[in-house]
């Protein structure tokens, strides 16, 4: 299935049906009085997060969603039928953004979460509603309220606990394949990964989700390479794993390139907890590993893990470090949502 994480959608709620002007006409009843029914309500447009979807590709082939209008009222106090609602089924993690591309209307992060995008118009009143002590036979009724036209953007941000960052060919997909059941495309050329991949990782009886996004290059924030369009998919992550190719002769420059792109992207991404790992040590001798690790630790100001995705060396240590950050972040969220007790 093709991956699509941004699309424009046009929606319209249904208008309300008009009220009915009608009078009761029966044999032997001279003054039957008004009996016009109300119009039906128009259908509303909703969005709902559902399980089993991980792309917005369906909205490429259908961008217009118009709910049906309510039926007009009828005589004998019969109310018109209401229009059916329309529900846009989107993946969990979808942001709904207004036409200005800035205002976030809703962020659907849980299965079953719903948001009303356009309310259907109310049905008009029939003439029965206007009967009074001074007007026994009203000949007026209300038209239904019109529906609402709206243009919105749907933007998918994958929900993962940890995000993989690095230059192209840093070994991100190999790491994901070695630590999870995910099977991303792996090859020895840049930009093998063209779309984000998710993998469920297990460590010490715990599970969490890792997102692998296409590699960044210098100038990605300005649109070079695949650009920074996929960085949105790691915005929700609790921790970032920065993989650096240990066989590169410019290992410190490679590290700083990614950090520079994170800072250029803006938001809180550059402030997220980061774990740095030097990959591909299976292709290095012990002296190279020691020298380049030392240089990288000097640049990062912290610990640098040494791993090999191909040989499986050092992977569990990195996974445990990731889990420690994720577990801490989950604990903080529980405290934030805990009800206050005296």
UniProtKB/Swiss-Prot annotation:
Record-linked Pfam families: GTP1_OBG (PF01018), MMR_HSR1 (PF01926)
Cellular component GO terms held in the UniProt record: cytoplasm
Matching PANTHER family: DEVELOPMENTALLY REGULATED GTP-BINDING PROTEIN-RELATED, MITOCHONDRIAL RIBOSOME-ASSOCIATED GTPASE 2
Listed cofactors: Mg(2+)
Binding site for Mg(2+): 173, 193
Presence of the UniProt keyword DNA-binding in the record: no
Gene3D superfamilies: GTP1/OBG domain, P-loop containing nucleotide triphosphate hydrolases
CDD domains: Obg
Subunit structure: Monomer.
Annotated ranges, domain OBG-type G: 160-327
SUPFAM superfamilies: Obg GTP-binding protein N-terminal domain, P-loop containing nucleoside triphosphate hydrolases
Domain Obg: from-to ranges: 1-159
An annotated Gene Ontology molecular function: GTP binding
GO biological process, one term: ribosome biogenesis
Similarity section: Belongs to the TRAFAC class OBG-HflX-like GTPase superfamily. OBG GTPase family.
Top-level taxon of the source organism: Bacteria
Name listed for the protein in its UniProt record: GTPase Obg
Subcellular location: Cytoplasm
